[in-house]
């Protein structure tokens, strides 16, 4: 989600990818295709036993919450950020971090 909910062009690309990979019918709605892709990603994460949150990864929530502003600042400075399909702002990143803690 995050990028798909903010950029329709990106959502269409992910929907197309979902159908190409066989997670959804080409005739399904883009919303259904995106849902199927997300389900497949979550299933893969669980199969590989990947942490679903930063807390599960071993990041202490109580220690991290006071550092959310710094984490967002650093993310905005990261070279990879400029390739993100949606130009998230500082508040967007804080919200994302809160969701995955």
What feature does the model see in each segment?
Residues 11-101:
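C-terminal charged capping/lid subdomain of soluble metabolic enzymes
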